[in-house]
């Protein structure tokens, strides 16, 4: 497990240095370090939010529960505008699927929300705040996706993130986690 995590981190550093990394993944280590969030947690949250074939999608949108994978920021902005014209209110944006309705006012523009650096940075800061508020990374992850009154959604989400952590070598199924997620 540690070897896979070390390999991932090494490859991220190498690809970041070569400027060939996925723009979302290139920001994971920087933001994780800045806000003291375990990189495996931040990466696994990203995979849970926008992971396609093991890679985070920088211009992904979730419009009222429907995933849209735009190829560019411009295309994502167009999809966002069309969704708003149709009356959509709950729209998640970017690498880490930041919800525009609840968090959009913390960005200067839609372009900032879609910027991988700002998107991942905000997600890491938000997770750190949730951890401080709720005491554990498990609760922070659960609340990242669903509000305090939605225990079933929190459980499903947390278990998906744990599964991604295990799949990428950043964690193992503990007896407690297995019991919690498979009950």
Indicate where each model-derived feature is located:
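Bacterial N-terminal signal peptides
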Residues: 6-17
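Catalytic glycan-binding domains that act on GlcNAc-containing polysaccharides
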Residues: 22-183
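Positively charged n-region of N-terminal signal peptides that target proteins for export
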Residues: 1-5
């Amino acid at each position: 497990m540690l070897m896979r995590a070390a390999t991932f981190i090494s490859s991220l550093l190498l690809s970041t240095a070569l400027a060939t990394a996925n723009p979302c993944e290139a920001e994971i280590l920087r933001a994780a370090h800045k806000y003291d969030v375990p990189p495996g947690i931040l990466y696994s949250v990203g995979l849970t939010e926008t992971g396609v074939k093991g890679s985070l999608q920088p211009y992904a949108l979730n419009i009222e529960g429907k995933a849209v994978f735009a190829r560019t920021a411009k295309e994502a902005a167009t999809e966002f505008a069309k969704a708003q014209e149709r009356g959509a209110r709950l729209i998640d944006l970017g690498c880490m699927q930041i919800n525009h309705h609840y968090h959009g006012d913390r960005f200067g523009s839609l372009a900032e929300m879609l910027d991988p650096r700002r998107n991942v940075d905000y997600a890491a800061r938000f997770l750190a705040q949730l951890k401080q508020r709720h005491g554990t990374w498990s609760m922070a992850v659960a609340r990242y996706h669903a509000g305090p009154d939605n225990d079933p959604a929190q459980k499903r989400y947390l278990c998906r993130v744990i599964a991604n952590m295990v799949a990428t070598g950043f964690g193992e199924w503990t007896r407690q986690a297995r019991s919690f997620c498979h009950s």
